[in-house]
Amino acid sequence: MSARISHPNLSSENIEARAYQLKALKNILHSSTLLVLPTGMGKTPIELMAVADKIYESPHKKVIFLAPTNPLLAQHYKDAKKFLNIPEESIIMINGGINWEKRQKMAQSAKLILATPQVIRNDVIRGSLSLVDCSLMIIDEAHHASGKHAMAQVADLYLNQSNDGLLLGATASPGSTDKSIINLINRIG
């Protein structure tokens, strides 16, 4: 059974949520979480409900939403503009095709930054982006957040810079061994 969710930062179309999605959201809003759901079971609505709530709860902070590929990033950007009730200009999508100085300027007024992990990593290392004022970082396809992958590096940078921020890793495939799953959970925080 699903219910329509009403929130000031969700569009009038509202998102339908099932009980398991609301239970997951409750956990996400209180502690860093690895969300594992099969494809098609509604990870994106959970992510967007978390974005809506964190922007509402901490309007002076940002949310960063990472995706490993530009096509996936574009889909999340489209979904965010459709389902979030925040000024459209405060939702930005940045990738390596945009000059870092322009990205820096765009990020200053953004509430939601959708980006590839390489861009965030490079901008943080360069000093053109700070993660201190980020209340939530979402790592979509979180199974990539291992080893020296840019997703893992950004997660580490975020956990080192953010005092009270939350990390949400979402994936349908956390790993094939207990060790890889435990490593991913430890990496997410």
Residue ranges and their predicted role:
Residues 1-189:
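N-terminal helicase ATP-binding lobe
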